């Protein structure tokens, strides 16, 4: 079944889409699509990762059948265009951006399969003994890490010219039988039994009356919310409503390593890092007490601290889990009548969802710093497939852009990691791994497609106890449906036994309650409706959950240029009616002004459009509606290749195109320094407040410096509705945003 792209607008839309194309699995693709499908795991250029060129900004297509080029009815006639294109300077027409490949694919919905009840599964395991043998000898076409070869069209003009590539992340390793696995040494000899350790109270020996009462409240969707102000942060703390009227308090503050219940080995490796910084102090109490967390204050400056805390917590959890299993193995060798429940259905316990291979490299490097392994198996293979030390960007690119896209920016990867006392093993088979690193697309492809001649394989997610989603704001610009698909398939009861010793499986696994014990931690630069909904739908931790976000001063005061900013509010009856209400307001209140200016000089008007679906609607309006026939325009979306974008920028600079339509995802992936901007119209506000500062401030400032615009004569017009409150508060500030949504007036000016 084909897997849809983002559909432009994250909320859906009937059409697939996404800006970043990639070879797909069984017809499903990443952001932008695969050429004709291809088999699972394969991808063009997989051995080096995608890098730039075919990666960022997206492949065109993915929206059903379409013409090869958009026919713009408002452009000058063809002959004039050809003459003028010859005069375009090489500097303007080649803006140092690699070409983005084209792809097309139809979209289909896919329903996630639900887990079967445990007892029926157990009966099926007992009646089908062959299933158990699958762990030892996988056929080549089965398993999430299988070696896969893909026939991927390498030339859009010659579909017969195909190249076979091997998946750099493929693993040709059998699934171990836990009962036949070699004996392992303890990670350290410290005593795990500490009744005050959150690992004990949450997983190993939780109070049954307490967690059962809380699970019952969660199933009835009864949550208690307490808003807590702490420093400059707002903390929304949610706990299951069990009838306790006392105010729920956050976990005790943690100021350093000494306040944590760490394995001795980790405490020694972190001995020099005694004091936590502000970011670490903010996340540590919830993180190490196994509560769900949506942290919305991640920045480039705090990214290292966030990774350190995430990796320390993940390693602490893995080491405690493995040591408990190893110690109990020894006990059972002495007395096999003991009942020791210390594990789940499968071995993987931690899942890290990351946007790029470079993000994975940074997380792995932090794990190595904290764990300090004596040996690293397959490290060279990891470096060859993930590390890219080439310099791709100049220093004038924004810091957050370089942090995300420097290095290997391939967004299709998956990696299993296994720990022993002395060794870290990279590229371990998923069922033999302790930690799984993956991008949403990479993990989606590992799970498989219903169109493939095999069943979906997501049993390796059945016993995940810790999910860490880092740089979630970047994942929003990929195919968010893949993230939702992954969460839908977490902690389902497995369909195969995988050699599991059910006598050692914890009771809450057998009772299908694993999702209530899983901790989910999401790190993002800001909050969005998608992230809030992800936490609402998939975070059911019986210990509670919290959202942390800052009080925003607003970026309008940091534009770096004096300009008039007008915010106009329009009414929408519901969030579903918002797109139509927005378009109606635009055509009635904004377009007439553009038409009047066209008679004089409307050149230099940039219209920023966050949603691709809205972009298509506005573009078609400018191309076909007689009301704007006097307004020439160009457009740059995430699907525009480099020559198209170069022509649009050049024509806009020279004034041939008086209006330029520009999408948020095009800016996210390319960060074009567009020249000639005199006025900016925000059809909608960007999620990322940095984009507002760069476009409303940076573009106008460049025009003033180039003497194309008189000082202070630039103008910014913003359209917003009450459903834009999250975006609005980051732009104008938390205090102003509330007033702008509720006040009777609908126009607000800032200078």
UniProtKB/Swiss-Prot annotation:
InterPro entries attached to this UniProt entry: P-loop_NTPase, UTP25, UTP25_C, UTP25_NTPase-like
Gly residues composition bias: residue spans: 10-44, 54-64
Polar residues: bias regions: 113-129
GO cellular component, one term: nucleolus
Keywords: Nucleus, Ribonucleoprotein, Ribosome biogenesis, rRNA processing
Bias-annotated ranges (Acidic residues): 78-112, 154-195
GO molecular function, one term: U3 snoRNA binding
Principal location: nucleus
Biased composition, class Basic and acidic residues, residue ranges: 137-153
Keyword set includes Nucleus: yes
Region feature Disordered, mapped onto this chain: 1-195
GO biological process, one term: maturation of SSU-rRNA from tricistronic rRNA transcript (SSU-rRNA, 5.8S rRNA, LSU-rRNA)
Localization per Swiss-Prot or TrEMBL: Nucleus, Nucleolus
Homology family: Belongs to the UTP25 family.
UniProt cross-references to PANTHER family, sorted A to Z: ORF PROTEIN-RELATED, U3 SMALL NUCLEOLAR RNA-ASSOCIATED PROTEIN 25 HOMOLOG
Stated role: DEAD-box RNA helicase-like protein required for pre-18S rRNA processing, specifically at sites A0, A1, and A2.
Protein name: U3 small nucleolar RNA-associated protein 25
Organism: Neurospora crassa (strain ATCC 24698 / 74-OR23-1A / CBS 708.71 / DSM 1257 / FGSC 987)
